[in-house]
Regions:
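Glycine-rich beta-alpha-beta "Rossmann" dinucleotide-binding loop(s) and their flanking helix/strand
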Residues: 5-25
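Short, flexible micro-motifs
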Residues: 1, 7-8, 73-76
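Generic low-polarity alpha-helical segments
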Residues: 1, 14, 93-97, 103, ...
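Short hydrophobic core segments
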Residues: 1-5, 13-15, 64-69
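An anion/pyrophosphate-binding glycine-rich loop and adjacent beta-alpha core
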Residues: 19-25, 29-150
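A glycine-rich dinucleotide-binding beta-alpha-beta segment and adjacent secondary-structure elements
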Residues: 133-178
Length: 178
């Protein structure tokens, strides 16, 4: 990969001597996004936060980094070892909090706050604005007492269970290992 010491020389040499080799894949590699999620991530390039990311067989509680190409950071690099093209990944943006419960509780104690006012305790402002544009744009100017409990539950659930399908990985160019 891009560290300078790695090359395909060993594999080429093994093939010349008819030695068996295993197929290689880029590993510990950032994931790319397309469409609206590419634009979303690109606008947030440099924003990082602790998350829990998973595929059905494995998950990691580490930092996630939004990049101009998609997603990176320790959680995504680890997950890339288990993810397969076309599969969805799940991202819990606040793994230590049930955000539906947080929003419903805040509605009782601070009914004049907005969704972003409550969630600003957990997320950077830029991320909150981007999430709002995707998931609750019609509620941007609403206070909690104006929002139905079911809507708050859905928003909280989305934040704890964001599912998306990466378009690929950055491949061998940025892979840490093969």
């Amino acid at each position: 990969p891009s560290l300078g010491g790695a090359s395909g020389f060993g594999y080429t040499l093994a093939e010349q001597f008819s030695l068996a080799t295993n197929a290689t894949d880029a590993s510990l590699v950032p994931m790319t996004l397309s469409g609206k999620w590419h634009a979303f991530s690109s606008a947030l390039s440099g924003v990082s936060l602790p998350v829990y990311v998973s595929v059905p067989e494995k998950g990691f509680a580490e930092s996630l980094l939004f990049t101009h190409r998609g997603l990176s950071g320790p959680s995504i690099l680890q997950l890339s070892n288990y993810w397969r093209l076309g599969d969805a990944i799940s991202i819990d943006l606040a793994p230590s909090e049930g955000l539906a419960e947080v929003l419903l509780s805040a509605k009782k104690t601070n009914p004049n706050k907005s969704i972003n006012g409550v969630l600003s305790e957990f997320f950077p402002k830029s991320l909150l604005s981007a999430l709002q544009a995707q998931w609750w744009p019609a509620l941007a100017d609403s206070t909690l007492h104006e929002i139905k409990n079911q809507q708050l539950q859905i928003i909280g659930w989305q934040l704890n269970n964001w599912s998306l399908v990466p378009s690929g990985t950055e491949g061998y160019r940025t892979a840490e290992v093969t």
